[in-house]
UniProtKB/Swiss-Prot annotation:
Forms part of the ribosomal stalk, playing a central role in the interaction of the ribosome with GTP-bound translation factors. This is Large ribosomal subunit protein uL10. The keyword Cell cycle does not apply. It comes from the Bacteria. PROSITE patterns: RIBOSOMAL_L10. CDD domains: Ribosomal_L10. Part of the ribosomal stalk of the 50S ribosomal subunit. The N-terminus interacts with L11 and the large rRNA to form the base of the stalk. The C-terminus forms an elongated spine to which L12 dimers bind in a sequential fashion forming a multimeric L10(L12)X complex. PANTHER family: 39S RIBOSOMAL PROTEIN L10, MITOCHONDRIAL. The lineage of its organism: Bacteria, Pseudomonadati, Pseudomonadota, Alphaproteobacteria, Sphingomonadales. InterPro entries: Ribosomal_uL10, Ribosomal_uL10-like_sf, Ribosomal_uL10_bac, Ribosomal_uL10_bac_type, Ribosomal_uL10_CS_bac. It comes from Zymomonas mobilis subsp. mobilis (strain ATCC 31821 / ZM4 / CP4). GO terms for biological process: translation.
Amino acid sequence: MERAQKVELVAGLKSAFAEAGVIVVTRNLGLTVAQSTVLRSKMREAGASFKVAKNKLTRIAVEGTPQAPLSDLLTGPTAIATSADPVAAAKVAVEFAKTNKKLEIVGAVMGTTLLDIAGVQALAELPSLDELRGKIVGLISAPATKIAQTIQAPAGQLARVFGAYAAKDAA
């Protein structure tokens, strides 16, 4: 790899890390191309990305940034999963690691916090931002729905009573 390519790769990693809510480091020793392709497509579906980069270049990219603790995790054949949603990359990586033993979670960085394997697994169990937004909208709209039902209930009951009297008089 030429120096210009390395500089470009480091710049790309820096911009990806700046936008990332979480950076998950995985060890992918023995992962086939087909398995890697499946993992990348699952990451893309979740709004995350999965990149294999040289550890030295990744260390240069995180140097002087809040994600600097990440460099402690970069040993051996590693790959980086990033996502703006703090849960997405961790969730996909943990789910894939459960079915494929060749992918090993090393750790992660969320903001300035270094997470170990247990921390990444705990993060993967949290609901995503979209799920949380859906729950909040449901909680906000539930009282309004109940109010509307309560207001409509007496009118419906009156209509049924009048209908019963009309049916009784007709009989």
